[in-house]
Amino acid sequence: TNPNAIVGLTEFMADTKLSRKIELDFGHLFGKWEKQTELIVFNPPWLPASYDPEGNDEAIYYNENLFPDFFEGAKKRLLPEGKLVILFSNLAQITNVTKDHPIEKELTEGGRFQLEKCLKKTVKAASEKTKRDPHWRSSEEVELWVLINI
């Protein structure tokens, strides 16, 4: 519900060929899109919220319904054998915010998708100038999940 991503992408695409092939919509999860597709890419917030996030906090924290709502909506909108590509992180687990991993939970309990692959990349060390405590940074991994509609 923050339009900055749409504004930024619109400016980035400008008058490129992409701008003629991609239609953007500002809305919750799938917005106005109902038509089935072969690919859905999702870059959700990486930390569960302990309160109801608003504004810029929605880019960092997700509420308890985000992932169940997303997976339910994705199932309806993916063609048979269509793919979900999800960018995520183990940040919530290594900082002990939660033990639950929403993508792993969906694969275990949801019965809607099958894992094709999960690629992980270690995050670079934080700058020595940072004031945040980066002791967990060496354990952080960014994850790229590819799930297939079953």
Q: Can you annotate each of these PLM segments?
A:
Residues P3-A5, P44-D69:
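Mobile active-site "lid"/loop adjacent to the S-adenosyl-L-methionine
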Residues T10-E11, D52-G55, V97-K99:
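Short amphipathic alpha-helical segments
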Residues L18, L78-P80:
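Helix-to-beta-strand junctions that scaffold the AdoMet/dcAdoMet cofactor pocket
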Residues T1-F42, P48-A49:
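Conserved SAM/SAH cofactor-binding pocket of Class I
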Residues F70-A74:
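Class I S-adenosylmethionine-dependent transferase superfamily signal
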Residues P68, E81-S89:
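Conserved beta-strand signature within the Rossmann-like core of class I S-adenosyl-L-methionine
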Residues I94-I150:
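Class I S-adenosyl-L-methionine
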Residues W46-L47, S89-I94:
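Short "lid" loop at the C-terminus of a central beta-strand within the Rossmann-like core
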